[in-house]
């Protein structure tokens, strides 16, 4: 059971890191804005799953509590869906705006060292 639980959490973390890597490697073309939207949605969904699973599985280590706090902070403070939709509707051809929103997404995930925490924990499973 514990191995399955840890494996499941590790898979969710790896999916978050994969989406983060995709966002990092976008080239700021108009089509990349659509990819950014998809990857941000994936990350948000996986963060919610990760947060809920950590709580439900009763893993109360300081590492998981710290991760949960970082996820809650991110979810409460960052939502790029409105901005991305606005850009898709009006400025999707402006590569500078695409780059700026991509940089904002990356910065938000690095703030409070959320991605670093996920990376470290996924390597320790």
Where are these regions (language model features)?
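Short terminal alpha-helical segments
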Residues: 1-46
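Residue-level recognition of alpha-helical coiled-coils
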Residues: 28, 52, 59, 66, ...
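Charged, low-complexity interaction regions
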Residues: 24-36, 57-62, 87-100
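Exposed, low-complexity/repetitive linear segments and helix-based recognition motifs
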Residues: 3, 21, 34-36, 65, ...
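Short, solvent-exposed, charged loop/turn and helix-capping segments
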Residues: 46-72
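Amphipathic alpha-helical binding modules
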Residues: 73-125
């Amino acid at each position: 059971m514990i191995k399955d639980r840890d494996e499941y959490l590790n898979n969710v973390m790896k999916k978050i890191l994969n989406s983060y890597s995709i966002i990092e490697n976008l080239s700021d073309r108009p089509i990349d804005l659509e990819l950014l939207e998809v990857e941000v949605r994936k990350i948000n969904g996986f963060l919610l799953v990760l947060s809920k699973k950590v709580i439900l599985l009763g893993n109360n280590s300081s590492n998981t509590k710290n991760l949960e706090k970082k996820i809650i902070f991110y979810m409460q403070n960052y939502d790029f869906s409105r901005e991305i939709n606005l850009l898709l509707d009006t400025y999707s051809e402006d590569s500078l705006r695409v780059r700026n929103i991509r940089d904002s997404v990356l910065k938000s995930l690095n703030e409070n060292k959320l991605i670093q925490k996920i990376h470290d924990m996924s390597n320790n499973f």
